[in-house]
Swiss-Prot record:
Main location as per UniProt: periplasm
Gene encoding the protein: surA
Top EC group: isomerase
UniProt-recorded name of the protein: Chaperone SurA
Taxon lineage: Bacteria, Pseudomonadati, Pseudomonadota, Betaproteobacteria, Burkholderiales
Disulfide bond positions: none
Length: 448
């Protein structure tokens, strides 16, 4: 039986994170600074400007997001400086996208907003009301969604489409994960402080950067040092606002020099020497280790036995009608109705004759929205209506099992991991080059 085909979907990280928000002390402090700062130019970016009003609006959103995530909100001046630098990078990319003729039409924006609403169990009008009730203007929300889609297309054109992964790299990666020490492979959670110093920079500039990095290293090594705070205040990496936290990484996804350095560290320790990387200097702290969760390090994959009911949209049935019908069906199933009978009667998928049964599905065999919803379900649980490009689905998980991954599946996993690592590094390099080639004048003193 043919499975639901995969397709690439763009999701808006910024707008998706602004769902449940509350007023913050930082936002109130910003308003207290007075309206006189609202139209002040805080940055010149090539032939464009960023105003104080734009900055304060974005800072308010970020502060509320941090509060929602129960993360500490930095002091107002520090947060404004960090957000302004983010906005400068964003504005430069938007300018480049426009120069490249990249546009995002209204239909694409609406489709993305629809997926965000569906992911939160709402229809679009409900989602809009929720966003506005939290103090976020809907037109700003839509504009940010369009911007993120534009920048995603720009990155695909300028960076991701140029990434190649050879069969030799795949073979080497799999060998490193499945070698004699595969059973003891550990993922590493690291924090880092980055000081920019491209290899092609004048030697005098490299010397200045190295001196700065050495000073920061001594601060990081000092007894009682707060590495996270130091990274937030001093790191020149994009993740500075997160305290330089890289999350868990497999050794194969990290530069070999970094892996070698942290192999000698205990959790909580800072590497005592600087690490020279192509575009600067790294100060690294090992936070913790854990058993590897990289699928390529194990021949096992988790398969899911799943069935579904699909109602297509546009065949005499509107979005709201399809969704409401599935809500009604789900209610009957929850009250003791037979999922299989409902699937045979109502489903518009080829699996209807089998009661909606798709059999055992491996990771990556379904469209992302379907797989994400499926992965959140317990055995026997029925999902709320899930929107994909095919229509609306009710999904029920019947069971899960460990299975041997095929050679091709392991190769695909390895290729994806290598490609992601190379793409992230290439994107970081490309952003720095784009920033260096742009005219930027920061007029906000604390951001300098």
């Amino acid at each position: 039986m043919k499975k639901i085909l995969r397709f690439a979907a763009v999701a808006s990280g910024l707008v998706a994170s602004l769902i449940t928000v509350a007023p913050s002390a930082s936002a109130q402090a910003l308003r207290a600074q007075g309206a006189s700062l609202a139209d002040e130019v805080v940055a010149v970016v090539n032939n464009d400007v960023i105003t104080g009003r734009e900055l304060d609006q974005r800072v308010g959103l970020i502060a509320r997001r941090l509060q929602q995530q129960k993360a500490p909100v930095p002091p107002t001046d520090q947060l404004r400086a960090q957000v302004l630098n983010q906005m400068v990078l964003e504005r430069i990319q938007v300018q480049r996208a426009k120069d490249d003729g990249i546009v995002v039409d209204n239909a694409t924006v609406q489709a993305t907003l629809g997926r965000l609403a569906q992911a939160n169990g709402m229809q679009l009008d409900q989602y809009k009301a929720r966003i506005e009730a939290q103090g976020v203007p809907w037109d700003l929300f839509v504009r940010d969604a369009r911007t993120e889609l534009m920048l995603s297309k720009l990155r695909e054109k300028e960076v991701d489409s140029k990434i190649t992964v050879s069969d030799a790299e795949v073979a080497s990666y799999i060998a490193s994960q499945r070698g004699p020490n595969a059973g003891s492979q550990q993922d590493l959670r690291l924090e880092h402080i980055f000081v920019k110093a491209p290899a092609n920079a004048p030697q005098a500039d490299i010397d200045v950067a190295q001196k700065k990095a050495e000073g920061l290293l001594q601060q990081a090594l000092a007894s009682g040092a707060n590495f996270e705070r130091l990274a937030k205040n001093q790191s020149e990496a994009d993740d500075a606002k997160k305290g330089g936290d890289l999350g868990f990484k497999s050794p194969a996804s990290l530069p070999s020099d970094v892996v070698d350095a942290v192999s000698k560290l205990r959790p909580g320790e800072v590497n005592p020497t600087l690490i020279r990387v192509p575009d600067g200097f790294e100060i690294v702290r090992l936070v913790e280790r854990r058993a590897s969760q990289n699928p390529a390090a194990s021949p096992k994959i988790v398969q899911t036995h799943v069935r579904h009911i699909l109602l297509r949209v546009g065949e005499g049935k509107s979005e709201s009608q399809a969704r409401q019908q599935l809500i009604d069906i789900r209610r009957q199933i929850e009250s003791g109705g037979d999922f299989e009978k409902f699937a045979r009667t109502y489903s518009q998928d080829g699996s209807a004759s089998q009661g909606g049964d798709l059999g055992w599905i491996s990771p990556g065999e379904t469209v992302p929205e379907f797989e994400r919803a499926m992965n959140t379900l317990q055995d026997g649980q029925v999902s709320n209506p899930v929107r994909t490009e095919y229509g609306y689905h009710l999904i029920q998980v019947l069971g899960r099992r460990d299975a041997e991954g095929s050679v091709q599946q392991q190769m695909d996993i390895a290729r994806q991991a290598i490609g992601q690592r190379k793409a992230e590094q290439a994107y970081s390099d490309w952003l720095r080059e784009l920033r260096d080639s742009s005219y930027v004048q920061i007029k906000l003193p604390v951001a300098q």
